[in-house]
Amino acid sequence: MSLSEQVLAVNDDLPIRTDKPVHSGKVRSVYWLTEEDSRRLIKEKGYNVAPDAPLAIMVISDRISAFDCIWHGEGGLKGIPGKGAALNAISNHWFQLFKDNNLADSHILDIPHPFVWIVQKAKPVMIEAICRQYITGSMWRAYTNGEREFCGIQIPERLEKDEELADLLLTPSTKGVLKGIEGVSEVDDVNITRKDIENNFSAFNFSSIEDIALYEKLLKEGFAVISKALNDIDQIFVDTKFEFGYVNDAQGNEKLIYMDEVGTPDSSRIWDKNAYRSGHIIENSKEGFRQFLLNHFPEPDILLNKNRMDERFALATENSLPLEAMMDLSKTYLDIAAKITGAPIMLSDNPKAEIIKVLKEQYQLVD
């Protein structure tokens, strides 16, 4: 089987029984189950959710997204071998660790296949919960341009690139484009202050103003748990993005949970600790791929300037990236996943066929 056939690039065409449109994101696709199938699985599998809770099948792909574009490689390679399974395995590992440390639950109810989660529908908090322990990336670029206030927080002068910050910095941004919120620009991923959230907590989908402190607590606790575990395997947790939402448990009680993925090479920066101590940065995350793209194309401003999105999409569509770059990234994902989970990631020969088989035979979700 060829390399391109091992990659799951298209994940929104599976014959999963649903009566709603499939939601296809940059990396994951979501199939909302029928009310009948949701109720049946909750009863059969004993999921700790309300009997009428809507469930979904979430299928990850191997697609690679960077700078808001999907990239492809030479030879018809439409994704990164092993990426989807690696991301899910890492998230599964951290969510279990959160549970072991008595943190909040996640939206995941079941894991039928390395590419698949069965999830409970949640009401999302409309915030990208970003936190930073080091000054790097976009924050460093803004700092070099003279910015000293980030999301309402003043940071000191004379910081150096990639320096550890004295405290974990919470720098939230909007999740999508939010309209009608005073002082918040109607664009995607705009930075917001805690005051913005407090003044408009219901617009950000918080159930109460007190839950702002709860989300911050869960963000800090989750970061600390992952940071300690990564430190134990000589890695540094540099920065990350969490997402949160509300669900009801089996008794009908509303609770704030972790959503999406956590602590992955896509949602975080992870550095090699020993290299950092000797003054070098070795990226064990997607950041290395972003740096490759910035160096690969003659006009990196196209990738950084949101006013040049048409040019950026054309760049991603019209250019096949070197196979070596795609495979280097594959190695990054597979290696860091093996370090974190303690087990190698097994590559599927035909992930799509495997997914259909397990959902048909064990969950009766394919006709």
Swiss-Prot record:
Keyword terms: ATP-binding, Ligase, Nucleotide-binding, Purine biosynthesis
EC number: 6.3.2.6
Signal sequence extent: none
Swiss-Prot/TrEMBL catalytic activity: 5-amino-1-(5-phospho-D-ribosyl)imidazole-4-carboxylate + L-aspartate + ATP = (2S)-2-[5-amino-1-(5-phospho-beta-D-ribosyl)imidazole-4-carboxamido]succinate + ADP + phosphate + 2 H(+)
GO function terms (MF aspect): ATP binding; phosphoribosylaminoimidazolesuccinocarboxamide synthase activity
GO biological process: 'de novo' IMP biosynthetic process
Any Gene Ontology CC annotation: cytoplasm
Superkingdom, taxonomy of origin: Bacteria
SUPFAM superfamilies per UniProt: SAICAR synthase-like
Enzyme class (EC, first level): ligase
InterPro entries attached to this UniProt entry: SAICAR_synt/ADE2_N, SAICAR_synthase_Vibrio-typ
Transmembrane annotation, as ranges: none
Residues in coiled coil: none
Pathway in which this enzyme or protein is active: Purine metabolism; IMP biosynthesis via de novo pathway; 5-amino-1-(5-phospho-D-ribosyl)imidazole-4-carboxamide from 5-amino-1-(5-phospho-D-ribosyl)imidazole-4-carboxylate: step 1/2
PANTHER family named in the record: PHOSPHORIBOSYLAMINOIMIDAZOLE-SUCCINOCARBOXAMIDE SYNTHASE (PTHR43700:SF1)
Similarity remark: Belongs to the SAICAR synthetase family.
Classification via HAMAP family: SAICAR_synth
Protein name: Phosphoribosylaminoimidazole-succinocarboxamide synthase
Gene for this chain: purC
